[in-house]
Amino acid sequence: MRHSALLLAAALVAAPLSAQTDDGTTFRWSGTVASGHFIRLHNLNGDVRIERGAPGSKVEVIGQRTVRGGDGSLVRFDIRMRDDGDVVVCALWGPDMRCTDDGARGRYDSNWRRRERVSVALRVRVPDGVKSYARSTNGGISVDGVTAEVDASTTNGDVRVRTSSGLVNATTTNGSITVALGSAGGDAPMRFTTTNGAVTVYAPPALSADLEMSTTNGGVSMDFPVTVSGTMSGRQIRGTLGGGGRSIIMRSTNGDVALRRNGI
């Protein structure tokens, strides 16, 4: 009996990881991620695009290699399920990298990358209720139409997010951030930050929040009435929207910061 239970548990863990193919150019995976859990996407060199899938469908991931030199098949993909039920998808550059619960880890040989000039475009469809977590280093991130939480971060690239509901957090270093928020219950904070680029957030007219907007080299502007609780200038606003509540932080170093009504 105990042996049967162990086999069943192993099957349940392995099931979401089984439906995958890779022909050396295109990687495909589809599997179930429970509502309320994250699909966690880790790329290094290339864009990540996430779209809303059909209701009740599985998560679908396509990794498309673009090869400008070397052997594209040496860029590998790995999938793992975390103990908390989240599913991790990693694009791995080089033989010494591995996929962990926290993403791609291990020694990264930059000389190998120069020899194997490969980028990977990740295209993902998520059903309602599945949360999206996306990371890249050299590539943009776009998320369109999803219904649950989004956490998106890159180093060199723009971040664009449009949701109908759920929290959003977005960061980049060299790129702009454009976010269209839907409804977001609870009082968890949201952050939108970049170093070199603009930050623009479109929000519902009934938005209530404790707001902090700032830039060093640029301007701040907004379409909402605000009750000032701190500094208000051409480069910084700190105040309360509506009845206040969740913290919303919008920051840039070199770029404008704007809070607008309506959508992208």
Spans of model-derived segments:
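Bacterial N-terminal signal peptides that target proteins for export
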Residues: 1-7
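N-terminal signal peptide c-region/cleavage motif recognized by signal peptidases
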Residues: 14-16
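Acidic (Asp/Glu) and glycine-rich low-complexity loops/linkers
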Residues: 19-42, 47-135, 144, 151-153, ...
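Hydrophobic lipid-interacting interfaces of membrane-associated proteins
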Residues: 139, 157, 175, 197, ...
